Amino acid sequence: MKRALSFIAAAALSFAAAAQEPAVKVLAAGSLRAALGDVARAFEASAPGRRVELGFGASGLLKDRLAAGERADVFASANMEHPQALADAGKAAPPQAFASNRLCALGAAGFQATPQTLVERLLDPAVRVGTSTPKADPAGDYAFAMFERIEQAGHPGARQRLADKALQLTGGPNSPPPPKDRSVYGALMAAGQADVFITYCTNVVVAQREEPTLRRIEVPEAVNVAARYGVTLLHGAGEPARQFLQFLLSPAGQMVLARHGFAAP
């Protein structure tokens, strides 16, 4: 009897200790908000007592915060360069690719374009083109890389013309904070801030769910840009953080990402 009671007491103490463990703090690209929320819930369900605390923002700005000393356990970026910079600075482990994305055009209800006419419409001086902020947000970097590809595809001067006219509406250090629990892209387009916005295809899906009148236009393969997402463990992260990273990279975690439109890295 005493042995049984001792076993029960030990099990209870073990469970209580697990329940009191600090949450795994994850800082992640804003484009991962819905997907990583589901990954975190699936991880918590698979590991009783484990908790995940999520924070989202533009990957470049998150990288700067971590470089300046903010504490986190896991950093999930919309590119490989930002987590690699933290690794190079001795603050994190080498990053691992865990997902990929592509660019799409999110058009206002009245914006007329097809994949075949999209480039010409973007180059139209009357069309307002929205992007995220380069350097601060990889989505902006990818959009500007797309402008370069448009020029290389036979449109001399297109890169500079598009860069000059691009409205950098989100993702920058001075950008208005995104609305809580709503797609910033859907909100910007609903407010008439641009005629078309170049962003990730996964963001377009979320924006259209909230604003069904918005249009999705596929970016032609010849000028599209692949986005490769990287994740790293920050130095000082404990075993729960390692387990979360392993779950994210596992078939179970990858299945959740795929449901949200992310492809394999």
Predicted region positions:
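Hydrophobic h-region of N-terminal signal peptides that target proteins for export
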Residues: 10-19
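Sec-dependent signal peptide recognition
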Residues: 2-10
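Exported/periplasmic ABC-transporter solute-binding proteins
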Residues: 20-47, 51-60, 64-68, 77-80, ...
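Intrinsically disordered, low-complexity proline-rich regions
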Residues: 1-2, 15, 56
